């Protein structure tokens, strides 16, 4: 996918009125510190609408409790004061030290990016930034509050007695999620960390894409996207082109993650649950090599089949193409049926021909034919078997002509086609958000509701809020997660392996 046109609505270029209105002030601003810039009354009314100068958090918001913590800070639930109704999530970015004298050295690149993007984005299916406040050298981002997230909803359905998410709920969630993604991509924004924990759901059933800490503008980047952030997207939702070491990528990486989320809504567990290999930090000079994520790629191959240059023409240009022989051929399709799985070949390394990076040639024409046959079998996708086995609750590995109304099987063949379009190996062929929204999946069967809870009998628990640690001003900032809104409090994914 290539993009050569500038973002729609771009303004303020060198020849614009806004660019030439106040040259003196622009020169002055270069000399100011960040602290002075925040407090300077000249900034009032000139920045984004969400910006506030000299406002104290506790004057505007009553903190109800602590939600979660992350690398960059903590998230609190709050209620509005001064005639500002409603509940809010306040994300506090920690200063360099707390409880001691603070040396202000600046703001992290991730925080700046998140503040800049969120202040510009306005869409019903993207979490809304209400305002940003600087107080005592700490930054507070005030977001609209969402009572649920998809991880919490999925977890609720895994509790005994285990019960599937209603199909009309899944359809509404997917439509709203794709709507939010289309808005981001239309505005040249890659999310780069879509997963159930980052998809918020309000009490009224509105689905909102949240946590833009890894988001990035992808229109004409100065450097390859990988140079800025080597590791993007949580491992279970990471697209094949990222796993194969691609240095540049497109919104298709978000769409693969959306496909993984769709599959997880159906099965209540991650479809590709691999383990992440750690970076090698032992190299001289402090360089850090990105390891080939063999285990995660194997999980994809087990269901999707081995990638080939016929299915994915640019496969041979991937940096880790030569690592494909390390992978094993997938289990046979019988693994998704009622018959025993025949997996006697599953523990042999796959090295059957040059199209997979193997050695070309063979001793006889017979062995060559066998090799071609094995390659064809290894590249066959079993996603259809996985889908029908999942939606039929294990009853069949094929379509059900007369699926009971209200059952997952009622999502039918169009559900499979949408899933297959999102989980396409080739990012050029993968469905875009705009194309997915036009898919027959949303125009057949029950109408798509703007409230994903409409007709749903499940009562989902409220978000956990701690009353013991709700001092937004002086609390310490523990935690090791990259982002604090919200953190993945259900403990996933955590296991790593050293390659």
Curated annotation (Swiss-Prot):
Residue ranges with Basic and acidic residues bias: 463-472
Enzyme class (EC, first level): transferase
Sites where the protein binds ATP: 67-75, 91
Subcellular location as annotated: Nucleus
Co-factor(s): Mg(2+)
SUPFAM superfamilies: Protein kinase-like (PK-like)
Biased composition regions of type Low complexity, renumbered to the chain: 365-376
Catalytically driven reaction(s): L-seryl-[protein] + ATP = O-phospho-L-seryl-[protein] + ADP + H(+); L-threonyl-[protein] + ATP = O-phospho-L-threonyl-[protein] + ADP + H(+); [DNA-directed RNA polymerase] + ATP = phospho-[DNA-directed RNA polymerase] + ADP + H(+)
Major location category of this protein: nucleus
GO cellular component: CKM complex; mediator complex
One Pfam family in the UniProt entry: Pkinase
Active site: 193 (proton acceptor)
One function term, GO molecular function aspect: metal ion binding
Functional note: Component of the SRB8-11 complex. The SRB8-11 complex is a regulatory module of the Mediator complex which is itself involved in regulation of basal and activated RNA polymerase II-dependent transcription. The SRB8-11 complex may be involved in the transcriptional repression of a subset of genes regulated by Mediator. It may inhibit the association of the Mediator complex with RNA polymerase II to form the holoenzyme complex. The SRB8-11 complex phosphorylates the C-terminal domain (CTD) of the largest subunit of RNA polymerase II.
Protein name according to UniProt: Serine/threonine-protein kinase SSN3
Organism: Pyricularia oryzae (strain 70-15 / ATCC MYA-4617 / FGSC 8958) (Rice blast fungus)
Organism lineage: Eukaryota, Fungi, Dikarya, Ascomycota, Pezizomycotina
